[in-house]
Regions:
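ATP-dependent NMP and nucleoside kinases share a basic, alpha-helical "lid"
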Residues: 86-163
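Conserved lysine of the Walker
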Residues: 19
Length: 222
């Protein structure tokens, strides 16, 4: 891998597969930018819920997207119109609605444009559902992460409990199953593995092993 050329690493997969944690560590190891695209979609969802907007196309949603200022602070936490809402976007309220809002063509178009703007300026790793198929179909490196849904549910359940959320394991599991269904079946930019992506099953491996697999393919020794 040349250190002088800009490149994109596309990391796709379903909810709870460890994409974000893995992407952050890969970015840190390589010294490149990490773009949390999932946080961007969660931020749009939270902003829409704040305003009581239904998940449908129309002038109200267009106006929201037009005036929505998304950014990240020094710790890579999402900023919505300059205000950190990191803890709120990770809650079950947003998790239960994000797949519905992010399926809207206007939302995906707006977020895809923002993601491409960032990715064209610097080397970066992006994690999401359609990075390797839609956002950066010509990305130099593409990976697709899969994990048994019960394992994903247990991981997410533990995370939510640590954050003080009152939720049951069954609720988390049902939420993941439904999100998988919505993400994979939507017409616009569905969750699917790019033909040229490397699949990584994270069910029985640690985060560090996930990171190392990507670094091995990229050609870097951690």
């Amino acid at each position: 891998m040349s250190s002088s050329e800009n490149f994109v690493i596309a990391l796709d997969g379903g909810s709870g597969t460890g994409k974000s944690t893995t992407a952050k560590l890969v970015a840190k190891t390589l010294g490149i930018t990490y773009l949390d695209t999932g946080a961007m979609y969660r931020a749009v969802t939270l902003a829409a819920l704040d305003k009581g907007l239904a998940a449908e196309e129309g002038p109200a949603m267009d106006e929201l997207l037009k005036n929505l200022d998304l950014g990240f602070d020094s710790e890579n936490h999402i900023l919505i119109n300059g205000v950190s809402r990191e803890s709120e976007i990770r809650g079950m309220k947003v998790s239960s609605n994000v797949s519905i809002y992010c399926a809207l063509p206007s939302v995906r178009a707006a977020m895809t444009e923002k993601q491409r703007e960032i990715g064209k300026k610097q080397s970066c790793i992006l994690d999401g559902r359609d990075i390797g198929t839609v956002v950066f179909p010509d990305a130099k490196y593409k990976f697709f992460m899969v994990t048994d849904v019960k394992v994903r549910a247990e991981r997410r359940y533990k995370e939510l409990l640590e954050k003080g959320e009152k939720v049951t394991l069954e609720e988390v599991l049902n939420n993941l199953v439904e999100r998988d269904r919505l993400d994979s079946s939507r017409t616009n930019a569905p969750l699917k593995k790019a033909d040229d992506a490397i699949e990584i099953d994270t069910t029985h491996i640690s985060i560090q092993q996930q990171v190392q697999k990507i670094l091995d393919y990229v050609g870097v020794v951690a």
